[in-house]
C-alpha cells in the first residue's frame, strides 16, 4: 500500500486541510477566475500555488496565475475535470469587457459599467449585421432581431459574471458592475502591444474572438482525432459540457 506521504507533501496536506480549500476548489473547478478582489481566496492560492498546481495536474489541468495576477484552471485535452465551452458571442463580449477595462472611461466612471454600455460598445466596434446573423442566419435587421441580440448579450454577461470576469454593483438585477482584471483572458494578444486599447478594438472589429487557450484546445482536439475513439465519442467528451 502506498504511503500517503509519498503522494501528498506536508505543505499540500496543510493546503487541503485549510477550511478555505473546499470553496476555492469548487470555484476553480466550475471555471471561476479568482482575482485580487477576492482577498482571502487569492491569498490562499498565492501561498500554496506550487503545491496546488501539482495537485491539479493529476487531473490533467494546470493552475495558472496570469501576468495580471488572477488564477484559473486551464484544462488539457485529457482533462478529468468537466469543462464548459464559451460561445463565439460570449468570447466577443469578453473582448469588449477587456476593451472597456482598458478605456479611460473606467477611471471616469469609477470603474462602474452597465449592460447597456457593453451592448452599445459591441455595436460600435463590431459589424452589427454579422452580429445579427450570428444570432439568426435569416436576420433582416428587424427590431425583433436586435432584441434577440440584446438578450444574447445579457446572457453572455451573466455567464461571464459566473466565471468571475465582472462583479455586480448594487442589487443583483441592477445591470451595473465592475470589471475584473481577469477579462485579460480575452486580451492576451494585446499585453505587449504599443496601444492595448486600439489593439483590442481591432481584434473586435476583425471578429477575432478566439482566445489563445481556446486555440490551443482546438489544436489538441485535432491531434486527438487520430485516437481510436469514434467521432461521436470525441464530440461527447469535448463538447458535452457546453452550457
UniProtKB/Swiss-Prot annotation:
It comes from the Bacteria. Residues 233-243 have a biased composition (Acidic residues). Disulfide bonds: none annotated. InterPro entries: MukE_C, MukE_N, Scp_MukE. Keywords: Cell cycle, Cell division, Chromosome partition, Cytoplasm, DNA condensation. One of its GO terms (cellular component) is cytoplasm. Residues 223-243 are annotated as: Disordered. It is found in: Cytoplasm, Nucleoid. One of its GO terms (biological process) is chromosome segregation. It holds the Pfam family MukE. Gene3D superfamilies: 1.10.10.2250, MukE-like family, C-terminal domain. Interacts, and probably forms a ternary complex, with MukF and MukB. The complex formation is stimulated by calcium or magnesium. Involved in chromosome condensation, segregation and cell cycle progression. May participate in facilitating chromosome segregation by condensation DNA from both sides of a centrally located replisome during cell division. Probably acts via its interaction with MukB and MukF. Belongs to the MukE family. This is Chromosome partition protein MukE. It comes from Haemophilus influenzae (strain ATCC 51907 / DSM 11121 / KW20 / Rd).
Amino acid at each position: 500500500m502506498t504511503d500517503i506521504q509519498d503522494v501528498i507533501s506536508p505543505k499540500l496536506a496543510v493546503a487541503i486541510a485549510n477550511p478555505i480549500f473546499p470553496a476555492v476548489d469548487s470555484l476553480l473547478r466550475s471555471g471561476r477566475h479568482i482575482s485580487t478582489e477576492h482577498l482571502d481566496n487569492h491569498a490562499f492560492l498565492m501561498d500554496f500555488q506550487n503545491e496546488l498546481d501539482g495537485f491539479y495536474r493529476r487531473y490533467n489541468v494546470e493552475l495558472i496565475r496570469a501576468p495580471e495576477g488572477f488564477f484559473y484552471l486551464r484544462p488539457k485535452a485529457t482533462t478529468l475535470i468537466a469543462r464548459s465551452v464559451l460561445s463565439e458571442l460570449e468570447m466577443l463580449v469578453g473582448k469588449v469587457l477587456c476593451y472597456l477595462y482598458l478605456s479611460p472611461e473606467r477611471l471616469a466612471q469609477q470603474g462602474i459599467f452597465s449592460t447597456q454600455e457593453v451592448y452599445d460598445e459591441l455595436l460600435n466596434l463590431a459589424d452589427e449585421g454579422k452580429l445579427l446573423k450570428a444570432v439568426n442566419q435569416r436576420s433582416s435587421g428587424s427590431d425583433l432581431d436586435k432584441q434577440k441580440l440584446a438578450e444574447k448579450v445579457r446572457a453572455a454577461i451573466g455567464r461571464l459574471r459566473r466565471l468571475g470576469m465582472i462583479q455586480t454593483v448594487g442589487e443583483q438585477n441592477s445591470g451595473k458592475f465592475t470589471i475584473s482584471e481577469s477579462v485579460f483572458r480575452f486580451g492576451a494578444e494585446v499585453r505587449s502591444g504599443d496601444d492595448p486599447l486600439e489593439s483590442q478594438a481591432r481584434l473586435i472589429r476583425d471578429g477575432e474572438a478566439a482566445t489563445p487557450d481556446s486555440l490551443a484546445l482546438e489544436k489538441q482536439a485535432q491531434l486527438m482525432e487520430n485516437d481510436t475513439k469514434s467521432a461521436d465519442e470525441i464530440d461527447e467528451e469535448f463538447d458535452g459540457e457546453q452550457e
